[in-house]
Amino acid sequence: MTKHVASNLSKGRLEIDHNSHVVRIISKTGNYSIHKYQYSDLDSSDWGYIYEKYVGQKYEEEGFQVEYLGLHKGFLDGGMDIVISKDDFKAYIQCKFSTKSRACFGKQKIEWILYNASSFLSKQYKDKKLNFWLVVPTLALIKKELQEYFLSKNNFQDKVKLELKTIPMPL
């Protein structure tokens, strides 16, 4: 169902009904529902796309322009899900979602995220420091030493500033 969910998310606004355990995609005008999904029908990849849209909408509410690379390109997004910009600020974001409440990120996953980010960002660099954020619903997903490992790579080649951000998505 993943491709179908991502396609529908790119067409409208996300609404999550926690009481009914339903995810709705509403038209951008808010006049009608494009699609609705029961929680039980969604797999982990679907939830990943839903989280990307949720994070993007949070930044839209803060006045950022949001480009949804993950929703439009899927696994070909180059390791970057969202690009946000406002005035002369820009950040490249990788979103990672899990329904687990405990650490589930290993060092290999962090290295993979950094590898993909460096490949993508090297093509974006134009003599101005770039911002790369790893956004998760809770830092509990990443053990403290792996958070420190991620941040120890900060300012790699003095071109990119790394940050860990949390944006909770209640279910």
Per-region residue spans from a language model:
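Mixed-charge (Asp/Glu-Lys/Arg
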Residues: 1-171
